Amino acid sequence: MKKRIILGMTGATGAIYGKRILEVLKAQGGFETHLVVSDAGALNIHYELGIKRGALGELADQVHRIDDIAAPIASGGFKTEGMIIAPCSMKTLAAIAHGFGDNLISRAADVVLKERRRLVVVPREAPLNLAHVRNMVSLTEMGGIIYPP
């Protein structure tokens, strides 16, 4: 059975990170990837990589709509190895740190944390203000991993 990994891509710059993660997981084999791209993430994918969301989705095994809160990845019963959010906007990081599951990325991240699975976020912001740092601390205390690029 393949290991399931969720990849969220948000509106922060650095779409290449998410694309490369999908490429590497596909090349390695043994992984079932579930991709969720926010609307702002889709814009950045287009601006930074010159491709549409659908073209990126071809690298994933499953693509879920950002507004599909009923998707399987929004349930703790859907077993995964964890989730990576790359790039992760400060908005998404704040939503996760405060339990605000208003879309499928933040909801899936909430589920990953409550099920004690790995959540890795790749924040793309500099410099950081105090709210950013506090949200990163909160997410780390909840079991998340902050992985700056």
Where are these regions (language model features)?
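A cross-family phosphate/adenosyl-ligand binding-site feature
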Residues: 1-120, 126-149
